[in-house]
Amino acid sequence: MDIKCWGSRGSIPVSGDEYVKYGGDTTCIEITAKTGETIIVDAGTGIRRLGKSLIERDITKYYLLLTHAHWDHIMGIAFFRPFLFKKIEVIIQDRKFSGINTRDVFKKLLEQPFFPITLKDLNADIKFEKRLNNKFNIGSVSIETIPVSHFGGALGYKFIEDGKTFVFFTDNELGFDHSGSRGYDAHLKFVKNADLLFHDGEYTKDEYKRKINWGHSSIPQVLDFAEKAKVKKLGLFHLNQDRTDRQMDKIVNKCKIELKKSNSTIDCFAVPCNFEITL
């Protein structure tokens, strides 16, 4: 399974020289199965660049999964160029977001006064499928979901192929259980022994004291969680919109020092723009 990050920034996209390394695009992940299927997770602003890349690579069929429907995870939908072409097939997970199904989320985004093109105007063959929930397969990749702790609800994902596991918890508050969450112990079991975990690392310890119940974790909480879960690689995700490259590098160095103190072998990093890995 090949994994590429097209956006790891939280809440809102950013730009500027101080954000070059980790990037400014919001959440979007591309996963390629060994059988060739393309899986897209979340449609933040990173999906715009991904769309251009898919066209250049002449890939014409994709599966789109969403963790939740907050702005930073869907704001790239209207600018996903493959939607404009007839030869494209997009299979989208059909589920409920605070009582609203996926199709209606798309309809609301793609209508006046927000956007000049409607869902009906798109030329691609777009399907909404309910089977892409709970436990399911896309090609050679087995996928499981779990409700995580986030304001309004969100899903965490586990992707398994050839005994390798990638877990994606982009928006998850480890220090507070929001309504609908399966809880800390269930999350720990879900993540156990993952080869790669991308986890919400929005806040420092001091920042979190002022942001309890906001739906995001502190970095010390994430380190502790990853150690308990015995993951091999930990990628800090949903990077704070004000966090510069220099600040993020300092945080990662501090994380490595803390992990070394506890004799942990976890490879910890912050997920940068265009990060790629094969599991």
Predicted segment positions?
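Active-site flanking residues adjacent to catalytic metal/cofactor-binding acidic residues
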Residues: 41, 67, 168-170, 199-201, ...
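Binuclear metal-dependent hydrolase catalytic cores
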Residues: 1-167, 175-178, 187-188, 245-279
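Cap/insert and terminal regions of metallo-dependent hydrolase folds
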Residues: 176-266
